[in-house]
Amino acid sequence: MLSFTGMAYFPYDPSFRVTGHFVPDPKLATATFHTSHGSDKDYYHIGDVSFTLKGHDLTLPFFARSNDPAKIKSGQGFFTDALTGKGAYGAGRYINIDYQNSAHDVVLDFNTAYNPDCARSPYWTCPLTDLYFDVPITVGERDPHSLHHDAS
């Protein structure tokens, strides 16, 4: 029998807390993601956050499950990075922002990056992303399958 031993995180690093600029997508365009179960799942593109991290200019799109702005409270950004499959979960990680339907500055704290539910159970269906940051995101939740939870 397996027992829950807690969740593993990389050490906190304040340099992974950055301010970016959110630009909403007025069309809330449909984005179809392939999932961990081989099906497709529709999300709605709520906008993009542009930011600089470790000297790299990056953009992270954010998505919601609703296309009704009155019902959207937050958005999820899906990403992979240089540690994906090497200490970070192989299908990528997520980060959330509060939703406002206007351009504004927003803080992205990658220390809060988390694994999708499918990292812990094969019964969950999770969207997969091909967005790759060529920057090792050495903060946030680690791969729960990594025996040593080691980023090396």
Question: Language-model segments: which ranges?
Answer:
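A structural detector for beta-sheet-dominated domains
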Residues: T19-H21, T52-K54, P61-F63, T80, ...
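Mid-length scaffold segments of soluble, non-membrane domains
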Residues: T35-G90
